Amino acid sequence: NKQPDFLVTFESNEKLQKGISEIESEYPYRKFCPLENLYGMHLYSKLPFEEVSLRFLIEEDVPSMKVKINHHGQDVTLYFLHPKPPSPTENTYAKPRDVELNVVGEEIAETEGPIVVAGDLNDVAWSPTTRKFKKISGLLDPREGRGFFNTFHAKYPLVKWPLDHVFHSEHFALVNIEKLESIGSDHYPLYTELALITDKE
């Protein structure tokens, strides 16, 4: 039974929002963007927001969130992303996804302090796009040396890919990362526990 400080849902709409409304008592700080196009996003937090912004960086129907909190006296910046994948039913090419990751990566490179990025990037960790994002942003992948943590597809036992990601700056140490049991989605939940190193400059 996990009790994360932040819980983020992707592909979420008003129906899901109502269906899990009982958790709102545990998460007093929230930002919702329910959509019916599979790109809705809901953020639940136990920690207060200093700033929270809903952004449409590349496509007008694909949101992302940028959040700032203060934790143990340090300003922490959080990004939550879910760009469209290249597919016959979505984008026929990868450019919007790649551009969004480049934009966020370049923004992170100019941002000081602790940073975490989490989301369904619709891309695997070893792809040129994801590797470029890590290089531009300078962020770390907590899965390296620990496994793939294949979160998609939860309903096909022989076809699984690590499409859900968490990246963090060197201001954090990994405590735990694990793929949780299926909750009925086509993605498994990915639980990541990070410890902020409070004396990191």
Model-inferred region functions:
Residues N1-E201:
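Soluble catalytic domains of enzymes that build or remodel membrane lipids, polysaccharides, and related
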